[in-house]
């Protein structure tokens, strides 16, 4: 792959190979950087140096476990909020202060703040959303939970060589029997540790295991077990989209005939350019049931993908909601006491009303 310059950072061929790999298959083995080196033709030390540089350049945000929120007993939802333009930033900051808000963006739509929230099993999601609606001074809020998951699995083609109309070429996490599991205290301990950002060490899982008083083999085995049980979707990197050269982040939303929603959902999910694809509820002021996230290097590339989708599906009633500002993007922290602390400080009796 030719070298690629993003801002002040130049990504050579090995950088691009490494970034493409670790988004989907960071090795859950005792010496992961050595395993990655075998894939890209470098030594363990070279890969560690490369990884550390990409982390310092803030292209790699984090490497950690990605868990299935529902399987852990949490409830989550996308939420759309409309706030007066004069106070969007202040409202977004109030929303971002909630420990369960993992993503929060300003988008070019009447609903101008879009955020995702997850709450523990002993908390009511609607109550937390009502409180945030109140605190933000919102004029309108729509809760848009996942009714069906067709695909989730960000795979940014850092080389930008893949056609936007290409079909999915990697396995992506799709809907299964996603019912909450009863976790043992030992499993909770592993979740708490595996959600932490990976350290740049030859044997990083040994350090994690040591903090738990467990062996490295036991932790690696437990991680694979969590994947097998469907509690963990994968262990992988999350990149800073913009710093990796993906300046266009569009949420494509599609109005489709209700009886054919699944057919169109699976078609949309089949595109490699679509990282997330869901069915969500509609409202009188929101007729779009299908959501497909598209990340690209430019708006032109996004529109190229959408043109291919239109040509294949025949769908024409859609909107592209571009993110114009990122307020927050983290991974959800599970079993964190901050949830209870936030609730005690912010929830009012009126928030619990339907």
Can you describe what each PLM-predicted range is?
Residues 1-354:
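A compositional/biophysical signature of low hydrophobicity enriched in polar/charged and small residues
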């Amino acid at each position: 792959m030719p070298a690629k310059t993003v801002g002040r950072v130049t990504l050579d061929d090995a950088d691009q190979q490494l970034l493409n790999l670790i988004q989907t298959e960071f090795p859950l083995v005792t010496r992961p950087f050595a395993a990655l080196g075998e894939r890209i033709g470098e030594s363990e030390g070279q890969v560690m140096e490369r990884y550390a540089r990409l982390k310092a350049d803030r292209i790699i945000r984090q490497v950690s476990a990605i868990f299935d929120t529902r399987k852990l007993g949490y409830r989550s939802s996308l939420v759309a909020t409309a706030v007066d333009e004069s106070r969007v930033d202040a409202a977004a900051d109030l929303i971002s202060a909630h420990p369960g808000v993992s993503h929060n963006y300003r988008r070019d739509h009447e609903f101008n703040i879009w955020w995702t929230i997850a709450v523990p099993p002993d908390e009511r999601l609607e109550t937390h959303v009502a409180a945030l609606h109140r605190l933000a001074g919102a004029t309108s809020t729509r809760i848009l939970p996942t009714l069906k998951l067709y695909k989730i699995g960000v795979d940014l083609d850092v080389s930008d060589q893949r056609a936007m109309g290409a079909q999915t070429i990697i396995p992506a996490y799709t809907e299964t029997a996603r019912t909450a599991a009863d976790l043992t205290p030992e499993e909770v301990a592993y979740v708490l540790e595996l959600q932490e950002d990976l350290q740049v060490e030859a044997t990083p899982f040994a350090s994690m295991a040591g903090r738990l008083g467990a062996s490295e083999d036991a932790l690696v085995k437990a991680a694979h077990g969590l994947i097998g049980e469907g509690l963990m979707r994968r262990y992988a990197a999350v990149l800073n989209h913009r710093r990796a050269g993906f300046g266009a982040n569009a949420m494509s939303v599609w109005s489709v005939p209700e009886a054919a929603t699944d057919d169109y959902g699976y078609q949309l999910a089949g595109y490699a350019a679509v990282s997330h694809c869901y069915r969500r509820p509609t409202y009188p002021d929101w007729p779009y049931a299908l959501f497909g996230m598209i990340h690209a290097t430019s708006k032109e590339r996004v529109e190229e993908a959408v043109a291919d989708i239109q040509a294949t599906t025949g769908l024409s009633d859609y909107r592209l909601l571009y993110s114009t500002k990122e307020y927050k993007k983290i991974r959800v922290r599970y079993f964190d006491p901050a949830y209870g602390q936030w609730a005690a400080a912010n929830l009012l009796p009126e928030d619990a009303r339907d």
